[in-house]
């Protein structure tokens, strides 16, 4: 049997799990399809015994399909629009990202948490939830159970943010503009940002959704420097351990991240010539679906019992990152005169 045919059973299994997860994600956007995909994968893994037939396809989906999803994610980024609208929030975005990464790095040893999980929780909390985890996982060579743990943590605090932030914003007296920036900088995943801003708009009859989404997309750009930095750091560290040859910068660059940048540049260039952003809508949707497929594969490779037993430290780290980002976002708004 050829290599491609050997991958087919596992690929089809991930596809079959992704379809109901996608549907459930549309019904319950506060949770999101990737979380449903991981849950379905982990539940099936408890009873599924034909691993030899599907192993190659599951591995292909969790790696290659995931990287393809990140590349396609670039077609949702118009760099001109993001920078024009998101510049006001840039100091807040930089501050919240730096805060979460420093918290994750600083507390990793104290919590006795593995480096990869701490890194994924840090980037997921600070940049763009599941998409940032999807982009970072191949770069740091994270295991599937580490990815599942980080995604689960991000989901928990996404849900809490969507439920609590509209009331918190009202209690603090945030303006519509202030809440858009708050939701865009302090909520992790795009679907949760949408849910949070929509809840605010329903209460105040406003339109914060567009502003919050643009701020969120501006955060997404941080995928590039963060993943490239992590890639170079890891490659240099591994290089120093195994060899004394000169370090190659070109070989260390993750190609799929460069293709992500190229996709963003193509989108920006074509829209500047009058091409409608709707042209790229199907590619953006395909990117999201590929992420759901990859999360199903990761769920299939994750031991649910072990995840429950070892997830406490990751949840605590996620909670601290979440609170820190929330406080820094509000403090920066106060210092900049937005709030």
Swiss-Prot record:
Q: By its UniProt entry, which Pfam families does this protein fall under?
A: Cons_hypoth698
Q: Write out the entry's keywords from A to Z.
A: Cell membrane, Membrane, Transmembrane, Transmembrane helix
Q: Spell out where the chain crosses the membrane.
A: 7-24, 28-50, 57-79, 84-106, 118-140, 150-172, 256-275, 290-307, 314-336
Q: Does the record bear Membrane in its keywords? A: yes
- Alphabetical list of InterPro entries matching this protein: UPF0324_pro
| Protein's cellular compartments | Cell membrane
- Membrane topology annotation: Multi-pass membrane protein
One GO cellular component from the entry?
A: plasma membrane
Q: Which PANTHER family match?
A: INNER MEMBRANE PROTEIN YEIH-RELATED, UPF0324 MEMBRANE PROTEIN FN0533
Family named by the database record: Belongs to the UPF0324 family.
Kindly provide the name given to this protein in its UniProt entry: UPF0324 membrane protein spyM18_1033
According to its UniProt entry, this protein's organism is Streptococcus pyogenes serotype M18 (strain MGAS8232)
């Amino acid at each position: 049997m050829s290599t491609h045919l050997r991958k087919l059973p596992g690929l089809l299994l991930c596809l079959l799990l992704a379809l109901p997860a996608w549907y459930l994600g549309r019904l319950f956007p506060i949770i999101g399809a990737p979380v449903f995909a991981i849950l379905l994968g982990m539940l099936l893994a408890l009873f599924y015994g034909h691993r030899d037939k599907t192993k190659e396809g599951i591995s292909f989906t969790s790696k290659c399909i995931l990287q393809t999803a990140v590349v396609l994610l670039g077609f949702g980024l118009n760099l001109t629009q993001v920078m024009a609208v998101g510049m006001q929030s840039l100091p807040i975005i930089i501050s919240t990202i730096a805060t979460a990464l420093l918290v994750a790095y600083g507390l990793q040893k104290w919590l006795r948490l593995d480096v990869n999980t701490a890194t994924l929780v840090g980037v997921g909390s600070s940049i763009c939830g599941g998409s940032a985890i999807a982009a970072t996982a191949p770069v740091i060579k994270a295991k599937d159970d580490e990815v599942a743990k980080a995604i689960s943590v991000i989901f928990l605090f996404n849900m809490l943010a969507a439920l609590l932030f509209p009331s918190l914003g009202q209690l603090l007296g945030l303006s519509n503009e202030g809440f858009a920036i708050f939701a865009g900088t302090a909520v992790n995943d795009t679907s949760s940002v949408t849910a949070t801003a929509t809840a605010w708009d329903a209460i105040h009859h406003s339109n914060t959704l567009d502003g919050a989404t643009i701020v969120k997309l501006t955060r997404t750009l941080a995928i590039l420097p963060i993943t490239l930095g992590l890639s170079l750091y890891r490659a240099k560290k591994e290089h120093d351990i195994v060899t004394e040859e000169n370090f190659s910068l070109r070989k260390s660059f993750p190609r799929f991240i460069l293709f992500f940048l190229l996709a963003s540049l193509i989108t920006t260039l074509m829209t500047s010539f009058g091409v409608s952003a709707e042209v790229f809508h199907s590619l953006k949707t395909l990117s999201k679906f590929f992420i759901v497929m990859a999360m199903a594969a990761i769920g299939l490779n994750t031991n649910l019992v072990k995840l429950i037993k070892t997830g406490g430290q990751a949840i605590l780290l996620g909670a601290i990152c979440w609170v820190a980002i929330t406080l820094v976002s509000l403090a920066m708004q106060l210092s900049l005169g937005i709030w």
